[in-house]
């Protein structure tokens, strides 16, 4: 049998992208892993030395680390969960035919394409306890009598930043789910109508099963992105007040700003491992489904 000639052309096409990925992802990750095993404080460059697992031990003994990790879990669960619910509803609405649907679709993408830094600043002004628009609206609706310093109180700051990240992420869920909805054959719904299926039955028997993979990959991406998000929280509260909005990624960023790169790198590696525990089971499940 004649051997198939090795074709180098596809590898040449992929090589530039792989080189870029190696430069901007692989090398920094390896560097971060190396720093996590060192006492790497840029304020004391002469004291940089290998300390083995000392940074990791210190991290696990840090009460603020565990508080930030718990805040990260709440941040992801409520942030991504609400994004999915509202995004799913928006996708169902945009999948209907109505006048001006194209304009509504375009406008609905504005939160997603707006930079996170700008979103953080914009919502911080809206939440402002002195001249924020939310206080003005609530007063006109006679819901409050005195201004509420939303971002200065520990009991309101965290819900406020969650509302912001939900607003930002709804369009992404809506866009991805809408693409999945448009790929569902109309014959399935026609057959369901003939069988007398209700709207709820069609939703749970046809719609959701048909876009299950789309929902899962979209949710996975958002979990990773939201868990790693720094810009929105940092520009709104910087993790305060009293660390009430400090997620692990914000804690890492704040720690890196103190130039303690070894400690910050150790926390970053731990966060990456935590996210891997979410991503790997999904990938295994996906590969098993493809094999079946």
Regions inferred by a protein language model and the residue ranges of each:
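A structural signal for multi-pass alpha-helical bundles of membrane permease subunits
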Residues: 2-292
